[in-house]
Amino acid sequence: INRDKKQLLLVLGGPNKYYSYDRNNLEKIFENLKNLAKKYDLQIIIIPSMRTPINTIEHASSFFDKETIIVKNVDKKAYLSALSISEFLVITCDSTSMISEAALTGKPIYVAQIQSKKDDYRFRQFRKLFTKLNIIRNLEDKLEVWNYEKLDETNRVANIIKKKIYCHF
């Protein structure tokens, strides 16, 4: 980790029935991140998920320079550490669960769009809600810091249950 730079984390999902991880989609995302890292003097960290194909990780390794940290295997400690130390989070659009996990941090989350193979209505509705809640923005050519209320559904629901229980006594 380069302590003289802020970190930008890219969490890669993987192909599913809605999204393919073809070279063109990846090239657009990688090129955009490379430009943002240069523009804002950032170090990139790339973390795979269970669905990330090995050839996607290999492509990232050949595309980025040696300053980019690429975790080659799924590693929960590396994932949680990277979420913690990174100033900016970029998550591919194919994973609602990784976007939700990132929203627990309260940090700016950018969604890297991938062309869908078929109607991705459920994914679009999820992203529409998170955009409305000011949690996510589309990855483009600039980075900003913004605030939103962290998602903490476990405590929120626990408090509702407590109130309902106390009302019965």
Tell me the role of every PLM-derived stretch.
Residues 1-169:
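Nucleotide-activated sugar donor-binding and catalytic core shared by glycosyltransferases
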